[in-house]
Amino acid sequence: MSTGILKVQGDQVVGNDSKPVVLRGAALGGWMNMENFITGYPAQESQHRASMLKVLGQKKYDFFFDKFLTYFFTESDAKFFSSKGLNCLRLPFNYHHFEDDMNPRVLMESGFKHLDRVVDLCAKHNIYTILDLHALPGGQNPDWHSDNVTNYASFWDHKDFQDRVVWLWCEIAKRYKDNAWVAGYNLINEPCDPKHYRLPQFYDRIEKEVRAIDSDHILWLDGNTFAMEWRDFEHVLPNTVYGLHDYSMMGFPKGNKYEGTSEQKQQLESQFLRKAEFMSHHSTPIWNGEFGPVYANPQLDAGHEEVNAARIDLLDQQLTNYDKYRIHWSIWLYKDVGLQGMIHTDPASKWMKTISPFLVKKRFLQLDAWGRYPSKQVEDVINPLVEFIDKHIPQSKEQYPTPWATERQVIRMINQMWMANCLSDEFAGLFKDMSFDELDECAKSFHFDNCLQRDRLNRVLEAHAAPPDAAEGWQRPKSETNGHTAVRQELP
């Protein structure tokens, strides 16, 4: 049962009884904020939806996406999630569900249909939810997961985009201000402000506006540069939890294999502690809002069992570190087509049979950033260009986001934006002339009853779901700086 609306008390999150509540769970990525690697399409969500509308027509388009949103999370999912001891589901959503760019500041009530449903399902099974605005008008970062069809995060340069986000969060706060199972509002996912100071200034502004409507719920605020950097953050806001994201390159195809060496374990802990310096310095709660490896494909990857065992060992060590410091965490992610989720679609399902050949093509062309596999033919084309740029324009290595090398910038603009969008219609064409029943079967591929579970991953999560008791000697990270250490490492 709920202990009332959660709040921040010192470095803890507590209920009305002042007893600590540690939130641990996963994110429902790919649902109300779709992502290419999660469900299989190329490019960005808005481009995917435009192509699907072109191919299906309005009636079939509306039917399919409503069924998709319905089947993606049902009571069966809530029961399973709760059975693993997990108590918090992060709910990423795209602003497009609530506002039309051609009719701004007019609330689309339809956006709450599925958000309300899942919040209520989670509450029924004693699961808190964190509402996460994952895609903002103009794009808060240059990546696909903000539904940004460019590599320019224009949100930071246009006050009107910022005004619209303040307006939207105020509307959301009106709806959920009395809901004790909503753990709070994650106002911006992975912001990337090249000037740094505008993000904390915007947080100061929106905090006042939201608090005027809902003075009780916690605000969950990501750091800058994909939730890894705290430059120009000079103070903390009341009743606020600050969030980092803690992915490790060792969990991805282009990273080194995790072998459990003392050096690798130290690297994992040091990486986390650097990102947590700001929270440690200010003695606030610590939330790791995203982390987790991707997994090799049994149908495509030789040695997949060994690879996946090492990836889960890596995850287990990260969770051990988080237990040591008794932090809140939300793994990325709950459900997908087989790359990263706790559960995933069955290769024999209608959806997977329809798109599997296209997934092989995407992988070969490196159209998805997440879980990008080596592709010699692509790299033979791209690498000489990258070397040429680095030789003649060495400043290219210093462009923001600073964790991106030149190769990442080039691949993003050529492969993952332009080439991927060129194939949006081809992907949508896979569903051309499907009947309503066939579209329903495709959408139902994501229903819990039709999905497969990643058993060892789920056992590891269950083992770490309950935080260590305070009496067991958990530690508070020590801060030796003001929390402003710069980020210079590569992202997955």
What kind of feature is each model-predicted range?
Residues 35-46, 105-110, 137-159, 237-239, ...:
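Aromatic- and acidic-residue-enriched segments that line the glycan-binding/catalytic groove
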Residues 92-95, 133-141, 223-225, 332-339:
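Short, solvent-exposed turn/loop segments enriched in Gly/Ser/Thr/Pro and often Arg
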Residues 24, 269-405, 409-423, 428-430:
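Substrate-binding cleft of secreted/luminal carbohydrate-active enzymes
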Residues 6-7, 60-89, 99, 103-139, ...:
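An active-site-proximal structural segment forming one wall of the substrate-binding cleft
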Residues 48, 70, 104-111, 154-165, ...:
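Residue-level preference for long, well-ordered alpha-helices that form the structural scaffold
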Residues 61-63, 257-262, 302-303:
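Short, basic, glycine/proline-bearing loop/turn elements
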Residues 1-97, 105:
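N-terminal structural segment of carbohydrate-active enzymes
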Residues 2-9, 15, 22, 26, ...:
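Active-site region of glycoside hydrolase catalytic domains
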